[in-house]
């Protein structure tokens, strides 16, 4: 069973690179729009209602050709009723590559995106990502596709690493503070006993 994702929606404009929202996909078959799971990109996402398997597809394609190597990321909202075997095919300069996605698991990037890999593209051809529902069980979800240059992808990875490091440091400091408070509470209170010593009287000298 996938984790419940409580994140709020992200705007397309807040993401780097070229982002194609589900509204821009060329669809075959009947897809259902939804905003039930809030971790979507744009104005919502779509699902196949767990019906009509094999008859429904979604094609994401860039407005123009891409020149060079790009990292391709696929966005979806996870859930326990999602498919574990969604085939997503990237068409690139060297041919086609199909990746099988488990949509019950929270995506690792921003809790929304999963990397499909890095591929070379030709400037003369539009990049395409095809989502199929053949042989899937459970709801198939489409939300967005992101294309990042290698430099953009590496930068995003470093930013994410920095955020993770900050969170880890904060968590470690919190844990150390908690341990210190526990140790302090365990120490017995030592009573300070103060005594007054009488000064020796100095007699008169003869």
Residue ranges and their predicted role:
Residues 1-16, 104, 115-117, 135-206:
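Substrate/cofactor-recognition hotspot
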């Amino acid at each position: 069973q996938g984790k419940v994702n409580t994140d709020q929606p992200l705007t397309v404009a807040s993401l780097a690179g070229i982002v194609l929202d589900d509204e821009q996909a060329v669809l075959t078959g009947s897809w259902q729009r939804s905003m039930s799971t809030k971790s979507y990109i744009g104005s919502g996402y779509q699902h196949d209602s767990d019906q009509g398997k094999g008859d429904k597809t979604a094609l994401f394609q860039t407005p123009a050709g891409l020149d060079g190597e790009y990292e391709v990321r696929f966005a979806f909202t996870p859930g326990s009723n999602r498919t574990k075997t969604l085939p997503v095919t990237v068409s690139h300069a060297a041919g086609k590559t199909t990746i099988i996605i488990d949509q019950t698991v929270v995506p690792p990037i921003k809790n929304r995106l999963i990397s499909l890999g890095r591929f070379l593209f030709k400037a003369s051809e539009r990049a395409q990502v095809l989502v199929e529902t053949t042989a899937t069980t459970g709801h198939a979800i489409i939300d967005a596709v992101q294309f990042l240059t290698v430099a953009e992808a590496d930068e995003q990875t470093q930013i994410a690493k920095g955020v993770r490091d900050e969170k880890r440091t904060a968590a470690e400091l919190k844990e150390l503070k908690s341990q210190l408070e526990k140790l302090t509470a365990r120490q017995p209170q030592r009573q300070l006993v103060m005594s007054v010593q009488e000064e020796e009287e100095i007699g008169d000298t003869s």
